[in-house]
Amino acid sequence: MPYLTNDDLPISIRHHVPEHGQDIFRQTFNHAWQQYADDPRQEEIAHRVAWAAVKRVYEKLGTEWVPR
């Protein structure tokens, strides 16, 4: 299920990832969702791809996500 806005993201992402990181996650997830439409693991793959995109721009220091 694609996310239309950042408000639709899982609460753990909304509460811990900066807004720009949420944008990256949402856009990447939605793109991967379309790319893997025929894969039975579509949602799992889309989440992994989206997290990888966030981790290219941000890193987690303690409990905070900060720009690299």
Task: Give names to the regions the model predicted.
Residues 1-68:
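C-terminal alpha-helical interaction appendages
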